[in-house]
């Protein structure tokens, strides 16, 4: 607890004889910013909100030809970094491109199954979108393609509208429609510079959602891993486990389990080897492809498919056919496609931007978030017209891409070429690939999404964040992916509303032998001047919190008056509000200050404001509250305010 100063010989002193250090004899008045007309004020706010990075700064004072080239480079960064591209960079991109291709091919086949689509659509989605991104994206390290979480989310949302088994053609059309509008959503957010909207999904909520989705995805793989033919369509953990145990007596296939368990052990071992030595990064990257080749050959020579081992069977050969004519632009399915596309697009965008920023920070370069959104959006728009479903940045592939020494987005082009060759010549070889291998590959891929260390850190740092994390996690695994996402968004919004409507306030005291005033709970040695109560408001004061701020200040005052009365100290005569953290105030906030001022007047307590910012002091003058309060009751610092109050204090108890 802080100590309270006691008056000695009529002058305010503190325990131990401490007297607050006097500020400079020159007392500065609080500056009032020059008046701006409404249009200029609006344009300034608009610019700071949407164009704070001044995207046109490079275009200033440049000739038309230079501006055209800068504009072209802005939309297609390939024209920027492509000018300085060298064979040395190509060598790094070639190695990383071949490495991520070996990882993506088996993953794509499995991820397409998560979305309830034919495996070929997974390969299609790693051919066209990476080519578009390579031309328009600003990240050097991100690897594009289908990902587990988005595939599961898309499959769950689509299945809720159309059964893929009874109406496969309509289901496919809705998938392309959702992909188209996912791209439109992403591109629109970037074009209109609304990227800050994805920040409403907090890091804690994303950690919980991803962890829950990873467990859900792993549980879904038990169908292929155990060789179960009849499996629930639901994704919650109770329904899945119930389906698994019901099939235990007659539905499990021991050959399938043996294949899946053996290669999952191999994949996990390769991952451990890769972590132990950075030089062996290629081991876990190439392990999935080795698993597919070996298991496919084993099933082919033993004809294990005749013993109940489920295989991929037919995989169409050839490149992506056009699908523009399959997209719904009218009818009931249009609204469904828009709704699913917006949700899938936002989740895909959140994951991709987070991955891009992570690896950009590692290599000390910047990515333009809004340009990234446009690039990601355009690749999905083009993808939807070429038989692709929602693609985004893959963390596992991007990590391998980074470790392999990629230099530019050319690594995505190399990967696309390898996928193209696979589609043209190698797809028949996947006929005997066992589903258990695809299940093992997906389980191995989603394990890193369960970030226990991050959850522990969130719990230690912020309990409210942890509630968002755990709420999203349990929502996904016990109900459904979309409910988990809804919980994640809802709790994130609730936290924002709570912080806005219930801002923190603090009682300030003087740090001994200084003119500095700080929170008495943070600095127990800080002392309070008798007869003066100093309170800091740590937020802008708006209609949403103005009543709370006024009531909280009055409660601080009431509590302090009770302490003063019990200790027979001079009563509170001055209430100082430290306003430096108050960045803005609206009419409701000003009205709350007026009510507080009138209430204090009735109790013979003078209200004083210290260090209001330019926006705040300007509005206080425009509303005439500054005149009501009196110019001599507005000070530049708390120390100035306390110094002015001290001679006016009486010893009245």
From Swiss-Prot:
Keywords on record: Cell membrane, Membrane, Sulfate transport, Symport, Transmembrane, Transmembrane helix, Transport
Region called Disordered, residue ranges: 1-30
SUPFAM superfamilies, per database record: SpoIIaa-like (SSF52091)
UniProt keyword Iron-sulfur, yes or no: no
Gene induction: In roots by sulfate starvation.
Regulation: Interaction with OASA1 negatively impacts the transporter activity.
Gene3D superfamilies, alphabetized: STAS domain
Top-level taxon in the UniProt lineage: Eukaryota
Molecular-function GO terms, alphabetical: secondary active sulfate transmembrane transporter activity; symporter activity
Consequence when changing residue 511 to T: In sel1-8; reduces drastically sulfate transport activity
Cysteines paired by S-S bonds: none
Function in brief: High-affinity H(+)/sulfate cotransporter that mediates the uptake of the environmental sulfate by plant roots. Plays a central role in the regulation of sulfate assimilation. Unable to transport molybdate.
More about this protein: Sel1 mutations in the gene lead to the resistance of the plant to selenate, a toxic analog of sulfate.
Homology family: Belongs to the SLC26A/SulP transporter (TC 2.A.53.1) family.
Protein name: Sulfate transporter 1.2
Gene name per UniProt: SULTR1;2
């Amino acid at each position: 607890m802080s100590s309270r100063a006691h008056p000695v010989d009529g002058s305010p002193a503190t325990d131990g004889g401490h007297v607050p250090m006097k500020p400079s004899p020159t007392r500065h008045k609080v500056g009032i910013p020059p008046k701006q007309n409404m249009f200029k004020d609006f344009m300034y706010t608009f610019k700071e909100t949407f164009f704070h990075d001044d995207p046109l700064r490079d275009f200033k004072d440049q000739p038309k030809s230079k501006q055209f080239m800068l504009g072209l480079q802005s939309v297609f960064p390939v024209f920027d970094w492509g000018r300085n591209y060298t064979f040395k960079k190509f060598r790094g991109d070639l190695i990383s491109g071949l490495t991520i291709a070996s990882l993506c091919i088996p993953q794509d086949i499995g991820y397409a199954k998560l979305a309830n689509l034919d495996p070929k659509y997974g390969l299609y989605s790693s051919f066209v979108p990476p080519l578009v991104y390579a031309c328009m994206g600003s990240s050097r390290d991100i690897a594009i393609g289908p990902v587990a979480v988005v595939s599961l989310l898309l499959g769950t949302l689509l299945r809720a509208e159309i059964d893929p088994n009874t109406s496969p053609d309509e289901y496919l059309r809705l998938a392309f429609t959702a992909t188209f509008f996912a791209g439109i959503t992403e591109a629109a957010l970037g074009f209109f510079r609304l990227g800050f909207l994805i920040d409403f999904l907090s890091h804690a909520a994303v950690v919980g959602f991803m962890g829950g989705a990873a467990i859900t995805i792993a549980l879904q793989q038990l169908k292929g891993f155990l060789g179960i033919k009849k499996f629930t369509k639901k994704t919650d953990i109770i329904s899945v486990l119930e389906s698994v145990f019901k099939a235990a007596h007659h539905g499990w296939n021991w050959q399938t389990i043996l294949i899946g368990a053996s290669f999952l052990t191999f994949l996990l071992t390769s991952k451990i080897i890769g972590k132990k030595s950075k030089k062996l990064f290629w081991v876990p990257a190439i392990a999935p492809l080795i698993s597919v080749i070996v298991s496919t050959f084993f099933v082919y020579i033993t004809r294990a498919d005749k013993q109940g081992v489920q295989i991929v069977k037919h995989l169409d050969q050839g490149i992506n056919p056009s699908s523009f004519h399959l997209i719904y632009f009218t009818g009931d399915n249009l609204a469904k496609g828009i709704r699913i596309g917006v949700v899938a697009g936002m989740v895909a965008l959140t994951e991709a931007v987070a991955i891009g920023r992570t690896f950009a920070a590692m290599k000390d370069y910047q990515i333009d978030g809004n340009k990234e959104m446009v690039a990601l959006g355009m690749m999905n728009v083009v993808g939807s017209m070429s038989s692709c479903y929602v693609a985004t940045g893959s963390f596992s592939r991007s990590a391998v891409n980074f470790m392999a020494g990629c230099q530019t987005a050319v690594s995505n082009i190399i990967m696309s070429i390898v996928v193209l060759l696979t589609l043209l010549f190698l797809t028949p070889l996947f006929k005997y690939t066992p589903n258990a291998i695809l299940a093992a590959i997906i389980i191995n891929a989603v394990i890193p999404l369960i970030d226990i260390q991050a959850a522990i850190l969130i719990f230690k740092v912020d309990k409210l964040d942890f509630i968002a994390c755990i709420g999203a996690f349990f929502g996904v695994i016990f109900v459904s992916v979309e409910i988990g996402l809804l919980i994640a968004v809802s709790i994130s919004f609730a936290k924002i509303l709570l912080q806005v409507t219930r801002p923190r306030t603090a009682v300030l005291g003087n740090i001994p032998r200084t003119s500095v005033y700080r929170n008495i709970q943070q600095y127990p040695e800080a002392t309070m001047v008798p007869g003066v109560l100093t309170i800091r408001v740590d937020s802008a004061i708006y209609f949403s919190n103005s009543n709370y701020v006024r009531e909280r200040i009055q409660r601080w005052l009431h509590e302090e008056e009770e302490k003063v009365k019990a200790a027979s100290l001079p009563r509170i005569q001055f209430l100082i509000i430290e306003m430096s953290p108050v960045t803005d105030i609206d009419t409701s906030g000003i009205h709350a200050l007026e009510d507080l001022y009138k209430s204090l007047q009735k109790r013979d307590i003078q209200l004083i404001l210290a260090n209001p910012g330019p926006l705040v002091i300007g509005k206080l003058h425009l509303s005439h509250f500054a005149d009501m309060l009196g110019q001599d009751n507005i000070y530049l610092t708390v120390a100035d305010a306390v110094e002015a109050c001290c001679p006016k204090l009486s010893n009245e108890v």
